[in-house]
Amino acid sequence: MGIVDIAREYIVAWRRILTLARKPDEEEYSLLLKLNLLGFALVGGIGYLIHLGYIILTSG
């Protein structure tokens, strides 16, 4: 199997994915946005608590 065949299969696979893909509707987009913001806030809060604990433990 040559490089041309590999490239052709790759293009066919991506074309199949793009034909099955669809744009999210407004409700789905809103839900994904809320979940992403919640995840960012959760990770940021955990990072802040770890940093705060580090400051408290090393300062005294």
Curated annotation (Swiss-Prot):
GO terms for molecular function: protein transmembrane transporter activity. Keywords: Cell membrane, Membrane, Protein transport, Translocation, Transmembrane, Transmembrane helix, Transport. The chain crosses the membrane at residues 37-57. It is found in: Cell membrane. The keyword Membrane applies. GO terms for biological process: intracellular protein transmembrane transport; protein secretion; protein targeting. GO terms for cellular component: plasma membrane. The keyword Cell membrane applies. It is a single-pass membrane protein. Belongs to the SecE/SEC61-gamma family. Component of the Sec protein translocase complex. Heterotrimer consisting of SecY (alpha), SecG (beta) and SecE (gamma) subunits. The heterotrimers can form oligomers, although 1 heterotrimer is thought to be able to translocate proteins. Interacts with the ribosome. May interact with SecDF, and other proteins may be involved. Essential subunit of the Sec protein translocation channel SecYEG. Clamps together the 2 halves of SecY. May contact the channel plug during translocation. This is Protein translocase subunit SecE. It comes from Aeropyrum pernix (strain ATCC 700893 / DSM 11879 / JCM 9820 / NBRC 100138 / K1).
